[in-house]
Amino acid sequence: MEHTYEYSWIIPFIPLPVPILLGVGLLLFPTATKNLRRMWTFLSIFLLSIIMIFSLYLSIQQIFLSCIHQNVWSWTINNEFSFEFGYFIDPLTSIMSILITTVGILVLIYSDNYMSHDQGYLRFFAYMGFFNTSMLGLVTSSNLIQVYFFWELVGMCSYLLIGFWFTRPIAANACQKAFVTNRVGDFGLLLGILGLYWITGSFEFQDLFEIFNNLVLNNRVNLLFLTLCAFLLFVGPIAKSAQFPLHVWLPDAMEGPTPISALIHAATMVAAGIFLVARLLPLFIVIPSIMYIISLIGIITVLLGATLALAQKDIKRGLAYSTMSQLGYMMLALGMGSYRSALFHLITHAYSKALLFLGSGSIIHSMEAIVGYSPDKSQNMILMGGLTKHVPITKIAFLVGTLSLCGIPPLACFWSKDEILNDSLLFSPIFAIIAFSTAGLTAFYMFRIYLLTFEGHLNTYFINYSGKKSSSVYSISLWGKEEEKKLNRNFGLVPLLTMNNTKRASFFCKKTYKISNNVRNQTFITVENFGLNPRTFYYPHESDNTILFPMLVLLLFTLFIGAIGIPFTQEGLDFDILSKLFTPSINLLHKNSESFVDWYEFLRNATFSVSIAFFGIFIAYYLYKPFYSSLLNLTLLNSFQKLNSKRIRWEKLINFVYNWSYNRGYIDAFFKTSLIESIRRLAKQTNFFDKRIIDGITNGVGITSFFVGEVTKYIGGSRISSYLFLYLSYVLIFLMILFFFYFEKF
């Protein structure tokens, strides 16, 4: 056992040979490296599998022995300061390692097919290997300095992966936005780390917690300064886990390849913030104000993420806002002191959301056969519909992931989300109302995504759109660059009826029609039966087996992973593996956690949350399920048009909700006008001051010296007699001035 732990330090470095060898190979032997590209995929999967098996073994040992292992090496810089680095293995480390490796392996298998057409295939796997190394290094770190080092590496890798198709301006802007937003959080984290070191004199977690708690209990430190340092530490997870108000980078991160979206939004980058708060919870828990701030930020993010997901048309952005909302639930649980519930939801959500993102990638892959390599079209749910018969396996996997996220039993997220909802009842009635209401919103927007994607008929082939016949369509090259291609003259490029009149999604049809104003301004999308294009020949198709296999494995995880945390302890049967793993665990809401849930209490608590979820599903079916005709997607606004004017206020409310959601709560616009524009103006003024004033003074002195020298040289004429004459003249002038001032005094 002890011998096994001694080799745990190697965990972060096992995936590292792949990016190193790829970099060296592409530099020195590019042709051979590219010809053996499938070998690099196999090697990446094999190395991650080793870590997964090792992490599973460590977890099994910890379930039975409940031990924590830490090994530290000391590097003495001088007599007063020494830097210690090492590894820290506890249940949280084991759980995160298993999560990172299992999802990472499945994403790598998926990416082998999904990215096979891309010229950046090897670059993609090099980034992925480095990303996995960074995350594994983060979760095994034994001190805050190591955490910060790997934290920055995770941010750098996410920058590279989000901007993978860097030739597309929108992707380049997205990765810059993610990078800059996370720099704000990272700066706060760095200040918090330095403040804690100034207070405690240690970076090591165990020493830090012990010293910190003693200082607080004995009132030997300024509580205000302590709270400030703790809050600065929390700013880092706010940005990394996309919590309000530093969440603005998350939807734009969808510009990267879909496997990256699955990895970032499931088990890696966004989970890093939750991991760090969980790791530092013994420090936060002694400061009640910080715990309340954590829970407050969490509940705001829960509601905001759900409302922003209501009207998204891009399937990946809808799932991104869903991730934001679910991360809010985890942060809420940590702020309430429910450590187990937060980590349980982290696990169940990771597998469910990875399934949904890989499913969306399969859908996008199938749509590209029709609309080309253009995210504006292949990810637009309004162009989808009726995919059930074309991609049946993807449909089943996506439906299971959707039901899980909605909290429908017995799927994974039901068990974890229900725990958080029940804990919120004990913590605050207001927080509980918001949390339960958001559970209904989650069910609504997730089934909205499902219905728009799979139900009805394929909307790409409907004909009721406006546009110019002489248009061009944009596709994405293998490097992600948008290329303009002229269409066949027999066809017209027609923009889709959209709720935002300034942005259009396009596809091919035979004719174009003008849309009346009353239809153009509709709140919800309505595609009416105008007939299909008789010249259409292409349909979506099911993805290859290497794409479907990871989805089916994640489907099994979604079905059964919730069993590890089922809180039933009756008649000698104990299914709660998670509580055994997290023993002793922090739980402020359940002091007596030996057997606080029985069958009756569980059914009573679960009935209400499941009822709310089914209500949200019903509303989604009412608005988006086509039931008047097989070719008619009925929405709420169609019903409003047949009712009297008393519905105008309700219609205005719906329009407000839509505009709020579609425009991202106007938060991006606020940041752009109040912060970005101000910073740009300041940068321009600073640039002007630097170029014109500072450089002007420096250059002016230089130019003046040059001209004085030239004049002096001209007057002197390079003759000694001239130099003596000038010298004596200057001395005479000096004496005259001195004599004048001397006699002035008398």
From Swiss-Prot:
Annotated membrane-spanning segments are: 9-29, 40-60, 89-109, 125-145, 147-167, 185-205, 221-241, 258-278, 280-300, 327-347, 354-374, 396-416, 425-445, 547-567, 608-628, 723-743
Give the record's keywords alphabetically.
Answer: Chloroplast, Membrane, NAD, NADP, Plastid, Plastoquinone, Quinone, Thylakoid, Translocase, Transmembrane, Transmembrane helix, Transport
* Catalytic reaction annotation: a plastoquinone + NADH + (n+1) H(+)(in) = a plastoquinol + NAD(+) + n H(+)(out); a plastoquinone + NADPH + (n+1) H(+)(in) = a plastoquinol + NADP(+) + n H(+)(out)
Please give the InterPro entries that the UniProt record associates with this protein.
Answer: NADH_UbQ_OxRdtase_chlpt_su5_C, NADHpl_OxRdtase_5_subgr, ND/Mrp_TM, NU5C-like, Proton_antipo_N
Task: Provide the topology term for how it sits in the membrane.
Answer: Multi-pass membrane protein
**What EC number(s) does its UniProt record assign?**
7.1.1.-
Cellular localization per UniProt: Plastid, Chloroplast thylakoid membrane
Write down any Gene Ontology CC term: chloroplast thylakoid membrane
Give the superkingdom in one word.
Eukaryota
Pfam families linked? Proton_antipo_C, Proton_antipo_M, Proton_antipo_N
Instruction: Give the Gene Ontology MF terms in alphabetical order.
Output: NADH dehydrogenase (ubiquinone) activity; quinone binding
Q: What is the protein's major site of localization?
A: plastid
Answer yes or no on keyword Cell inner membrane: no
What exactly does this protein do?
NDH shuttles electrons from NAD(P)H:plastoquinone, via FMN and iron-sulfur (Fe-S) centers, to quinones in the photosynthetic chain and possibly in a chloroplast respiratory chain. The immediate electron acceptor for the enzyme in this species is believed to be plastoquinone. Couples the redox reaction to proton translocation, and thus conserves the redox energy in a proton gradient.
Say which family it is in: Belongs to the complex I subunit 5 family.
Q: Which NCBIfam families does the record associate with it?
A: NDH_I_L, PRK06590.1
Q: State the protein's name.
A: NAD(P)H-quinone oxidoreductase subunit 5, chloroplastic
Q: Which organism is it from?
A: Nasturtium officinale (Watercress)
